[in-house]
């Protein structure tokens, strides 16, 4: 049979392997979330440009990014709205579950798009840093 010492050795080895996996996988997951947020912002930028081409104006700040998935009630040129919208419903949420922030007209460009990062608060560093559609300097 298996002795208690052999069992403890096996459990120690498994714990050691698990620790190595956790230390190496978790940072990669965080990097992937930041990368996804950057890609999402690019996709939303393209959807906003398509909306403007069809509707002749960007959605207002009040209409927000919801205007990309459902026709706003106060939209002019409603007959020009693309059937099915410009992004799928719920796509305007960052990898941490927070809505992307949209402002038109923007302070840094035609429009501003922002993810407040993992903490969902403006500012921050590292994983909590804002991810934006303009060059920060």
Q: Language-model segments: which ranges?
A:
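Phosphate-coordinating loops and pocket residues in cytosolic domains that bind phosphorylated ligands
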Residues: 22, 27, 63, 70
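Aliphatic-rich helix starts adjacent to a transmembrane/signal segment
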Residues: 24-43
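A residue-level signal for beta-strand positions that form part of recognition/binding surfaces
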Residues: 1, 84, 110
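Short, surface-exposed interaction loops/tails
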Residues: 31-35, 46-49, 55, 66, ...
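Non-catalytic regulatory appendages
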Residues: 43-45, 49-52, 62, 69-84
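N-terminal single-pass transmembrane signal-anchor helix
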Residues: 1-25
């Amino acid at each position: 049979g298996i002795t208690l010492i052999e069992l403890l050795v096996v459990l120690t080895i498994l714990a050691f392997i698990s620790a190595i996996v956790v230390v190496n996988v978790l940072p990669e997951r965080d990097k992937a979330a930041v990368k996804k947020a950057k890609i999402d912002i690019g996709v939303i930028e393209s959807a906003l440009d398509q909306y403007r081409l069809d509707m002749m104006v960007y959605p207002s700040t009040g209409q927000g990014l919801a205007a990309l998935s459902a026709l706003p009630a106060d939209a002019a040129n409603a007959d020009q709205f693309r059937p099915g919208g410009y992004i799928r419903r719920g796509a305007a949420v960052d990898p941490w579950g927070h809505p992307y922030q949209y402002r038109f007209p923007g302070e840094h460009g035609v429009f501003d798009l922002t993810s407040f990062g993992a903490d969902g608060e403006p500012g921050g560093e590292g994983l909590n840093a804002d991810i934006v559609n303009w060059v920060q300097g």
